[in-house]
């Protein structure tokens, strides 16, 4: 899934120069082509999920459309307050992409499992879940 996702990002970014990609220290073995092709439009925010979402909100406020990508609990639950306050309450076009959403994330343990992501996101104002 990650390789196909990376290719769809490349296809979209080729057509829309206002798109940016922000990841929470993920992407090895899948996103290297995105990083190589789009350089300054690819941001590795590191293990700083709240900051990653706030940076995305600021970029959206300035006219960009950020895609924020991480393992599901780190793009939904960990930065939940920033999603609510910085993204939803301002109705900003930030796209949150959670890898492994809606189910357990294998052997990585309970911190990487996220069975409640869809429910948590659906109750936020102006949030759309696909």
Where are these regions (language model features)?
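Thiamine diphosphate
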Residues: 1-130
């Amino acid at each position: 899934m990650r390789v196909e996702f990376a290719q769809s990002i490349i296809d979209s970014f080729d057509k829309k120069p206002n798109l940016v990609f922000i990841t929470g220290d993920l992407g090895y073995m899948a996103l290297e082509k995105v990083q190589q092709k789009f350089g300054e439009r690819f941001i590795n925010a590191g293990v700083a999920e709240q900051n990653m979402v706030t940076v995305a909100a600021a970029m959206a406020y300035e006219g960009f459309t950020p895609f924020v990508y991480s393992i599901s609990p780190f793009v939904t639950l960990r930065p939940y307050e920033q999603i609510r306050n910085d993204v939803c309450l301002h109705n900003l076009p930030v796209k949150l992409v959670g890898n492994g959403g809606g189910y357990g994330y294998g052997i990585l343990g309970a911190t990487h499992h996220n069975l409640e992501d869809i429910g948590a996101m659906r109750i936020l104002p102006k949030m759309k879940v696909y």
